[in-house]
Amino acid sequence: MVENNYLCWQVTCKSIYMRISLLLFCIFSLFSSLSRGSSIPFSPIVRSYSVSDYNAGIQNWSITQDDRGVMYIGNNKGLLEFDGNSWELHELPSRNIVRSVYIGKDGKIFVGSFEEFGYFERNSLDSLVYHSLKDEAKDFRFHNDEIWTITSAHGEIVFQSFGSLFFYDGHTVKGIRTKTLPLNLFQVGDTVYSQQINGGLFILAKNGLENLIERKLLGNSDVVAGLPYDGGVLFLTQKSGGFVYQNGKIQKWHTECDAELEKYSVNRAVMTKDSCYIIGTLSNGIYAIDKEGRLLWKENTDSRLQNNTVLGLYCDADNNVWAALDEGIAYIQNNSLVYYYEPPYRKIGMVYDVLVKEDEAYIASNQGLYRIRNRVPELVPGLEEQAWFVGEWGKQ
């Protein structure tokens, strides 16, 4: 009886060991394949947050993070604070939408709304208290000014509406009506750029906006984001894809999904620490593209996003990606060692082994051996029965 129990224990331990070994093998095989541009369309794990989680408005507009790792999201109901465990809503006195969020070097959380802007600051009890800056804009008459972007330039915090710019130096606020109509502001390195409505791309200099690139050189489309690219800048347009600007010259940035980006309208973009470009669209979710233009993964409502309209993107200190959506918030674990592949159909069955090569991959399952080329799985003829192992012998 003791011998039988010992044998059962041995079998059980061996079974557990084999399962753990297989799991670890699959995890590291899949992870290593990501860096090689595998033929399998691996995707990161996505965590979705809905209204029932954060108890505020459906729409979310912008995201940032403080040096403690706390996330702040501009929401239809105000400013959301998330410490990784619990959510807290901070309303503006006007209870208006918070469109834009930005954290200054001093830790102040600047926010923009309709004819309102200011900052939240922690008091001695570690609670956030709001300070309005609107009334500091002396002799400025507000007229439907909604603050869509906040950034820093030349030692000042800059608030942007579609017709005005406001500059806060830490003491006073100066508001100016611009001759052109700024669509946005975005910073690359020490330079702040501004796309003009129905116009070209400008630089925000100390003495105002200066024309940089004519609209026709950017596909006659609005630039919605700028990101570092090999010592230059990658400008992403809403309808004409990307353009690389280096040494005063501009050229098209080609990707595997140019047609989709042009069709679904680029709206936001960020770059991860490992130089992956995360691009959010207005109608088809999020694309992850490497510097060479290869599609690494994409997420939309056909996969794990709860909404396809991306209104804000942020790459956090851990290299994970947050998306402010037209409905909810998405947390994409870009920095995880675990990625996964979900076949377009379930005929693959139980997976026992995986072999990943540069241009193809093989999956051994209880339904046979599958080969994946160009992201499409197909059953290998003659191997339609259960397969436990797949490996290489020589070059085969």
Feature map (PLM): residue ranges:
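Carboxylate-rich, polar loop motifs that coordinate divalent cations or form catalytic acidic clusters
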Residues: 1-396
